[in-house]
């Protein structure tokens, strides 16, 4: 996992939560069956990157989502590496995160998708921005920069992927 996710898991451990880490197999992924075997009755969150930032290995996100569908477990995927490469679906995903810098948006902006049934609490209390999910004034220029970068990626995705493959 990317340090942004791994360090969050380590923080949860320091707060007294049990965290299970799974090692990737020879193909660089964690399989659905390995995740299924690691699930416990009290597992509340599974977090798996969509595409590995170092190897490019793509994880079976759709199958993991199907596995967790009827379980009391939320599913998060870090999609930062996948967003420019493929159209993503959020079917069965409770939380999806991505950072804008991978698609040439301003550094320091990203986005979070949250399904309507997934809980979320403000990290910092304060103003009522974003329906109370965050405190502080939104960085409108960065938001617009991310929006434009996302539009360009969607419009030119096939061309970009072909260029990546040729490199």
Language-model features and meaning:
Residues 1-167:
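Pyridoxal 5′-phosphate
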């Amino acid at each position: 996992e990317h340090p942004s996710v791994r360090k969050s898991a380590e923080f949860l451990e320091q707060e007294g939560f049990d965290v299970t880490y799974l090692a990737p197999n020879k193909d660089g992924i964690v399989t659905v069956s390995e995740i299924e075997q690691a699930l416990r009755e009290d597992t509340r969150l599974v977090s798996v990157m969509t595409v590995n930032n170092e190897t490019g290995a793509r994880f079976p996100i759709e199958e993991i989502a199907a596995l967790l569908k009827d379980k009391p477990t939320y599913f998060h995927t870090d999609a930062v590496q996948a967003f420019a490469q493929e159209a993503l679906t959020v079917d069965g995903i409770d939380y999806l995160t991505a950072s804008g810098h991978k698609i040439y948006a301003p550094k320091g902006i990203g986005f979070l998708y949250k399904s309507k049934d997934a809980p979320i609490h403000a990290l910092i209390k304060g103003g009522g921005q974003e329906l109370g999910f965050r405190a502080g004034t939104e960085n409108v220029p960065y938001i617009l920069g991310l929006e434009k970068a996302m539009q360009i990626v969607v419009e030119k995705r096939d061309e970009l992927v072909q260029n990546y493959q040729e490199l």
